[in-house]
Curated annotation (Swiss-Prot):
A molecular-function term among this protein's GO annotations: ATP binding
Keywords, sorted A to Z: ATP-binding, Chaperone, Coiled coil, Nucleotide-binding, Proteasome
PANTHER family per the UniProt record, alphabetical: AAA-FAMILY ATPASE, PROTEASOME-ASSOCIATED ATPASE
Gene name in the database record: mpa
UniProt-annotated stretches for the region Disordered: 1-27
InterPro entries in alphabetical order: AAA+_ATPase, AAA_ATPase_domain, ATPase_AAA_core, ATPase_AAA_CS, NA-bd_OB-fold, P-loop_NTPase, Prot_ATP_ID_OB_2nd, Prot_ATP_ID_OB_N
Database matches in Gene3D superfamilies: 1.10.8.60, 1.20.5.170, Nucleic acid-binding proteins, P-loop containing nucleotide triphosphate hydrolases
Lineage, highest ranks first: Bacteria, Bacillati, Actinomycetota, Actinomycetes, Mycobacteriales
Name the UniProt record assigns to this protein: Proteasome-associated ATPase
Naturally occurring in which organism (per UniProt): Mycolicibacterium vanbaalenii (strain DSM 7251 / JCM 13017 / BCRC 16820 / KCTC 9966 / NRRL B-24157 / PYR-1) (Mycobacterium vanbaalenii)
NCBIfam families: pup_AAA (TIGR03689)
Source organism superkingdom: Bacteria
UniProt family annotation: Belongs to the AAA ATPase family.
Coiled coil: 22-99
Length: 615
């Protein structure tokens, strides 16, 4: 390309229309313009009409060709601009790919000269910040990005992954904490700025520990799980996973004493033991009477031990609200339901630690003046008599831990321990002595009168009753329900052959026939009513006749007894002896008396070996 052509090409990006043409097109265009000018002169000189028309046509063709060339050159210019933009983008991509890698670190502190201390690659370093970084906005514990010259060029978020440690205590400066990590290793860590800020919030401006819908910061407390970077020595956030929450159900139960039938005497006992000390503290102080620290509810399964414990928490909350003048609907108490078997842990010391956390949580709740019920269900599975373990001796350390919590140096103000068990003989005697579980209440199997009371909780006037049954009592629903309950209880407690269950032979040669009533429970009564309701529903679907009938209940009793024919396989012989009034007598022989059972052969029980709860 000649110099003139290069100069013409360099003018392609000019502002004049001609400067946008290539050199060849510009020359051709100039030639066309000269021809057009000549033709115009000829047209002006020629006077003939034909010559004028031909010249005008030629001029029009030349102008059309000029427009076509101009459009083609404009398109070429657009293509050139697009290519230039793509080249620039590729150059930026090449530059980006060629940049050295960036490092990350944890900000430890900001100095007065706007340098910062950063922990990166296992080292603590003092670095400078890019002018784009506002050092005043940096927060301790924050992640920062470093360039190849180890200059802070970007501020990131707080670390979201790491190890979990348990907070032991916050040190006096409020910026450091003692945490316990893996294998009970203790270390001091710095608290990231969000955690420090939560500790200095004024009263009422932070979230309640149990309100999961509140997004405000929460104050730290011992036992909390913290996300920790052990290398940088920083704790970043509180993880809402206190280990005790897996084993504890914090709730305000909705069970009242009115929901419990047939246990009036036991309810009065537990109200005297639990509610009086809470509601009349001044009288107890006046008489120098120490409130009981714990209550043991023992008896056969399914007789209402857990229901009573829940009702205590509910009633106590309402009574405390009345004393304080608060709204009964906002009554507050805590029922810590400990899942006994899940409390056990295969690692040495873990079970004891969970027990400490549970009582620590209870003390925190109770410090606010709120009653706290710590309920240990199946207490015999956790606090068994020391020295009786067959494959392990875990009870030798778990039992002392509970004893130290109940009557240790730290008092249990506003905390009551309630234990429930159907094998109270297996619980360590040190727990059952006065001063620990002071009050022991036996929840017995219901007699006929108690059974009627329990039935009345499930058979209410609101239930649909069959018209034929209502007609017998002139449509009076109350009398109908009462008659149904009486008939059902009479059938259930009748000493007839159909109700015979077992023949027990004692070591002294005495024999005794036991009936199904001797093994009745509130749970069985509820099951009978539920079966009857199901039969009534099936009758509606099959015949269209609505309503519960007495026959549905009687049939349910037969079905329930039939399902419990194997009850001897799951009942403790010592319990049978207590029911029959022959305490201390060994059972040496059992014969089932259930009619129509194919496998009703007599069965001897070897009482020399330790049978435990299950035969």
């Amino acid at each position: 390309m000649s110099e003139s052509e290069r100069s013409e090409a360099s003018e392609v990006f000019g502002t004049s229309p001609d400067s946008r043409l290539s050199s060849e097109d510009a020359a051709e265009l100039e030639q066309l313009r000269r021809e057009a000018a000549i033709l115009r002169e000829q047209l002006e000189d020629a006077g003939g009409l034909a010559t004028s028309a031909r010249a005008a046509r030629d001029v029009h063709q030349l102008e059309a060709r000029i427009d076509s060339l101009a459009a083609r050159n404009a398109k070429l210019m657009d293509t050139l601009k697009e290519a230039r933009q793509q080249l620039l983008a590729l150059r930026e991509e090449v530059d980006r790919l060629g940049q050295p890698p960036s490092g990350y670190g944890v900000l430890l502190s900001v100095q007065d000269d706007e340098t910062v201390d950063v922990f990166t690659s296992g080292r603590k370093m003092r670095l400078t910040c890019s002018p784009n970084i506002e050092t005043k906005e940096l927060k301790k514990g924050q992640t920062v990005r470093l360039n190849e010259a180890l200059t802070v060029v970007e501020a990131g978020h707080f670390e979201s992954v790491g190890e979990i440690s348990t907070l032991r205590e916050i040190l006096s400066d409020g910026h450091r904490a003692l945490v316990v990590g893996h294998a009970d290793e203790e270390r001091i860590v710095w608290l990231a700025e969000p955690l420090v800020a939560a500790e200095h919030l004024p009263e009422g401006s932070y979230a309640d520990e149990d309100d999961l819908t509140d997004d405000r910061p929460r104050k730290l407390r011992p036992g909390d799980s913290l996300l920790v970077d052990t290398k940088a020595g920083y704790a970043f956030e509180r993880i809402p996973k206190a280990e005790v929450e897996d084993l504890v159900l914090e709730e305000v139960p909705d069970v009242s004493y009115n929901d419990i039938g047939g246990l009036g005497r036991q309810i009065e006992q537990i109200r005297d033991a639990v509610e009086l000390p809470f509601l009349h503290k001044e009288l107890y102080r006046e008489y120098s009477l120490r409130p009981p620290k714990g209550v043991l509810l023992y008896g056969p399964p399914g007789c209402g031990k857990t229901l009573i414990a829940k009702a205590v928490a509910n009633s106590l909350a309402k009574k405390m609200a009345e004393v304080r003048g608060d709204d009964a609907r906002e009554a507050k108490s805590y029922f810590l339901n400990i899942k006994g078997p899940e409390l056990l842990n295969k690692f040495v010391g873990e079970t004891e630690r969970h027990i400490r956390l549970i009582f620590q949580r209870a003390r925190e709740k109770a410090s606010e003046g709120t009653p706290v019920i710590v309920f240990f269900d199946e207490m015999d599975s956790i606090f068994r008599t020391r020295g009786t373990g067959v494959s392990s001796d875990v009870e030798t350390t778990v039992v002392p831990q509970l004893l130290s919590e109940i009557d240790g140096v730290e008092g249990l103000e506003n905390v009551i321990v309630i234990g429930a068990s159907n094998r109270e003989d297996m619980i360590d005697p040190a727990i059952l002595r006065p001063g620990r579980l002071d009050v022991k209440i036996k929840i017995e199997r219901p007699d006929a009168e108690s059974a009627q009371d329990i039935f009345s909780k499930y058979l209410t006037e609101e239930l649909p009753i069959h018209d034929d049954d209502l007609a017998e009592f002139s449509g009076d629903r109350s009398l109908t329900i009462k008659a149904m309950i009486e008939k059902v209880v009479d059938r259930m407690y009748a000493e007839i052959d159909d109700n015979r269950f077992l023949e027990v032979t004692y070591a002294n040669g005495d024999k005794e026939v036991m009936y199904f009533k001797d093994f009745n429970s509130g749970a069985m009564i509820q099951n009978v009513v539920d079966r009857a309701k199901k039969n009534a529903i099936k009758a509606v679907l099959e015949t269209g006749q609505r309503g519960l009938r007495i026959q549905h209940l009687l049939d349910s009793i037969i079905d329930e007894f039939a399902e419990n024919e194997d009850l001897p396989n799951t009942t403790n012989p010592d319990d049978w002896a207590r029911i029959s009034g022959k305490k201390g007598e060994r059972i040496v022989y059992i014969r089932t008396l259930v009619t129509g059972k194919s496998s009703s052969a007599s069965r001897a029980i070897d009482t020399e070996s330790n049978l435990g709860q299950y035969l």
